[in-house]
């Protein structure tokens, strides 16, 4: 006897968001990422279609974190000392998105330089 999976219909939907603008759209990116649009809860793809695939985002920091687990520092290695190199390594690891976390210790000039270097590396 087959097992019937209970299904529910949700009245709302998750807003769709496009992150990143290509040059044709006035941005600096080579591609954009579209998220959202689901009309069901996460991982319940049998209830309704998932219009946009899940994406992976990796957070990098403007400064090397001193309080991270050795497991993470071993994986990222020396790339953690340079946000641009770290972003490139995150991209090579398969990240669809890179979250750049700036700190209050960054001066406005340093923050601008870090953002520009990460944009140039990705």
Please give the residue ranges for each predicted region:
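Glycine-rich, aromatic-flanked loop segments that form ligand/cofactor-binding clefts
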Residues: 25-63
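Short, well-ordered coil/turn segments that N-cap beta-strands
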Residues: 52-56, 94-96, 122
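Glycine-rich, proline-tolerant flexible connector loops at the mouths of alpha/beta enzymes
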Residues: 67-71, 95-120
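Basic, amphipathic N-terminal segments that precede the first structured/catalytic domain
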Residues: 1-34
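Active-site mouth loops of central-metabolism enzymes
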Residues: 4, 8-10, 55-85
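Conserved, mostly hydrophobic/aromatic
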Residues: 90
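Well-ordered, non-membrane alpha-helical segments in soluble/globular domains
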Residues: 76-87, 110-121
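A broad, low-specificity signal for short, low-complexity segments enriched in glycine/proline
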Residues: 15-20, 58-62, 119
């Amino acid at each position: 006897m087959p097992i019937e999976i209970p299904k529910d219909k949700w009245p709302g939907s998750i807003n769709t968001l496009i992150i990143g603008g290509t040059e044709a759209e006035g941005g600096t990116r080579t591609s954009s990422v579209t998220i959202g649009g689901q009309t069901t809860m996460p991982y319940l793809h049998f209830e309704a279609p998932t219009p946009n695939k899940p994406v992976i985002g990796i957070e990098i920091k403007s400064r090397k974190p001193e309080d991270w687990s050795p497991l993470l520092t071993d994986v990222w290695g020396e790339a953690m000392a340079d946000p641009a190199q770290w972003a490139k390594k995150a991209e090579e690891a398969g990240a669809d998105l890179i979250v750049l976390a700036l700190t209050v210790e960054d001066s406005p000039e340093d923050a601008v330089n870090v953002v520009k270097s990460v944009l140039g590396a990705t």
